[in-house]
Amino acid sequence: PHKPLDDLTADEIIEIVKEAGIVGMGGAGFPTCVKLKPAKPVDTILLNGCECEPYLTADHKVLLAYADEIIFGLKAILKTTGAEKGIIVIEDNKPDAIELMKEKVADIGNMEVFVARTKYPQGAEKTLIKRVLGRIVPSGGLPADVGVIVDNISTVKAIADAIQTGMPLIERVATVTGEKIKNPGNFIIKIGTSVKDLIDYCGGFTDDDVLVKMGGPMMGFPLNTLDVPMMKGSNGIIAIDTDETKEQPCIKCGRCVDVCPMELSPLYFVKYAKEENWQGMKDMNVMDCVECRCCQYICSSKI
């Protein structure tokens, strides 16, 4: 364990986070020690507890099981960054977590709970900032450009562990679920545990016709082998039916444009990618894409 939080300087906290190997645990894996030293002043810390990806409930479980650690971790971030306020954002389909966290922050003047409407992809950084604070992160910009830092709930819990117990980031809570898993649930797993061992621990598959994804059904990616490790940003494994649907040519219906949370035009990304027109993709602001795959989900051509 390190010194009490009140006795630690901002630089000491950042060094603790760095030595503990803490990264963004919502999937991005960006080093948290870098995020705690923003190039521009920030006034607000958003704790992302939305977990809008279907099937996954790991962050929900962390909110319920480690509420005190989350509050401690948020205090550490506020002290380190000099931000004035911390907001814990939770979707309205988690009433038990909302009630618990509201109790925890009731007597803390610079913390509050924001209840967001359950909507995918609410948890995307830029979407979250716009929804909660009404601020728009510029194209190609970072949350710090509008005075905000966004951290995942599990990341903040890891910060608390590092300061309070000295434990580096060697384990995390992850969801193993899907209709093909015999005994689904949320588990504390060691970083580096193979997907195969994790699925075996859950009793294996219900049958052999299965598609395994690292992450959720929307933003997760299919695995060709189960001999891969769970990483710091691995929030879940799902096992679902295989999808044999074949891709058809784009009919330019525009449904992908309608559902894009970043107000982009995904149909042109497909066109330009096939043409290897990378400048065209850049001109269409492809770097603002948050890879939520709403366009893929809604696409009538199954692109």
Residue ranges and their predicted role:
Residues 234-247, 255-257, 261-303:
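Ferredoxin-type iron-sulfur electron-transfer modules in oxidoreductases and energy-metabolism complexes
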Residues 1-25, 30, 39-40, 95:
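Acidic low-complexity segments
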Residues 39-48, 234:
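Structural signature of FAD isoalloxazine-binding scaffolds in flavoprotein oxidoreductases
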Residues 94-102, 222-229, 300:
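Short glycine/threonine-rich loop-to-helix capping motif typified by GTGT followed
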Residues 119-123, 127-136, 204-251:
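Active-site gating/interface segments in enzymes
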Residues 64-80:
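Histidine-anchored nucleotide/phosphate-binding helix
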